[in-house]
Amino acid sequence: MFKKILSARGMGQVLSVFAALIVMIIVFALINPLFFSATNITNLLRQVAPILIIGVGQSFVLITAGIDLSIGSVAGMSCMISATLMTKFNMNPILTVLITIVCCLAIGLVNGLLISVAKLPAFIATLGTMIIARGVAQIVNGNMNTNGIYSDAFKNFFYYGRFLGIYTPIWIAIVLFAFFAFILSKTALGRHVYALGSNYEAARLSGVNVAAAQTKVYVISSFLAGVVGLILTAQ
């Protein structure tokens, strides 16, 4: 993957994206002088934090040459479960978070087992769990709008709070990015992930537990989607 990025064509594509981004930043700065204000920058970072978190999970999946179509529905399911538990059942926020994350991990585990053990194509397996997660979300909240998250601690921890002047979603994204970047670059699981993406059969023959590695990848993806759902709930 990195060889493709570092190739002349790959570098050209990367540089063109950065050039377009720089042009957009310059244009917005000229249109509105407050674009580079600290308030605007922190608000932008807070809004893109969920995308970064989702991107971390998808990086694991894509490196293994897989695909996870269920992440959007898992995030939505996380929203509905957490919101319903706190509004309809007045559940403690900590217990709510634990139950929500466990439900999301279950979806990731099912994805991993369907792909690594049942040998279903990742597209088909995650399409099925996408539909399941979406159905669970609708069943949990009765297909009705859920309003009134009254737990200030929950809202501050996942969205509105600040630490050192920076919104908590940004800190959550930074911590998760650093943690999973470490896993990907410094642990056996990270090496196995790259091995799977490079050559699945060679990885298996070299002694890598490919089923376990694949399952962990999809569990990580669903876990991070669940965290994003909690952030969106707090928002």
Can you describe what each PLM-predicted range is?
Residues A8-R9, F123-T187, A213-K216, Q235:
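Transmembrane helix-bundle core of multi-pass membrane transporters
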Residues M1-L15, A19, F36:
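Transmembrane alpha-helical segments of polytopic membrane transport and secretion proteins
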Residues V23-I26, I81, I132, A178, ...:
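Hydrophobic residues within the alpha-helical transmembrane core of Major Facilitator Superfamily
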Residues N92-V97, A106-N111, I115, R162-Q235:
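Helix-loop-helix "hairpin" substructures at the membrane interface of multi-pass membrane proteins
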Residues A20-F36, A137-N141, A181-A188:
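Structural signal for alpha-helical transmembrane segments and their membrane-water exit/capping regions
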Residues M24-F89, L113-K119:
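Single transmembrane alpha-helix segments in multi-pass membrane proteins
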Residues L69, F89-L95, A122-F123, L189:
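Membrane-helix interface segments
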Residues V14-A19, L44, L52, S73-M77, ...:
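Hydrophobic alpha-helical transmembrane segments
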